[in-house]
Amino acid sequence: MEIRRFPAAEAVQGVAVDEAHVYVVASRAIGKYDKTTGEKVGEWTETEQGPILHLDSGVIVGDRLYAAHSNYPGIPMTSSIEIWDRKTLEHVGSHSFGIYRGSATWVDFHDGFWWVAFAHYGGRSGEPGKDPSWTSVVRFDEHWQERGAWVLPAEVIERMTPFSNSGGSWGTNGLLYLTGHDRAEVYVMRLPTAGSVLELVDVLDVTTPGQGIAWDRSGQEPMLYGIDRARREVVVFAPNQPE
């Protein structure tokens, strides 16, 4: 169920959220907005010749904003996690994966681990010989050492094709919520008890056509934040949470 929405010029790729602010992510810019009023209170913009090319979904962990970054639509795909001070929006760090499993599209921190999706695409944005079925969700420890990886089930890949997994955020119910690039749906996933394929629990209909999402876990009632890219708006939901 949609609760509210407000305009944000950076509503192109994704969002991150903490107890007081929403961080709205464009490819090379971030806007910081008051969560209650929707007023813009800060921003960061990459320089014309700067190294940050294509930011995507983000997450707040402690005093830092972490965002997935890639050279999309470049080939070969390269990826990194870029880091900002959430108070000042000063860029303070980077972890580079180099050429790895694909194009990093979202990052989250859950159950003591980092989780990152590495997307693959169809058409001209894809790597030769690979398609969206090569997309994976990878678990890392605090030192960014890989500690497990999973792929998406065929029925979810079919709904995302020719694009891929754009957003992801862990719910307080222990389930993983994923989005594609253009469909107004959220895919609720569970880690399998065996094998390498995530289990599809539910498909939620929403009013935002894909892109990055973030659970606001700071209050008693968790809220899901997303963006309406066409309207350049941040959208807040109170969806049902399956168990």
Model region roles, listed by residue range:
Residues 196-218:
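Conserved blade-ending motifs and adjacent loop-strand segments that build the rim/top face
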Residues 78-88, 131-144, 186-193, 239-241:
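Beta-propeller blade signature
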Residues 21-24, 65-66, 114-117, 175-178, ...:
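Conserved beta-propeller blade signature
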Residues 13, 68-78, 117-134, 236-237:
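Short, conserved, GDST-rich strand-edge loop motifs in beta-rich repeat architectures
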Residues 3-10, 45-50, 95-100, 150-162, ...:
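Surface loop/turn motifs at the tips and blade-to-blade linkers of beta-strand repeat domains
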Residues 39-73, 78-79:
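Blade-loop segments of beta-propeller domains
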Residues 152-192:
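Loop/turn-rich, solvent-exposed surfaces of beta-rich toroidal or solenoidal domains
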Residues 3-28, 54-57:
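Beta-strand-rich domains and repeat architectures in extracellular enzymes and scaffolds
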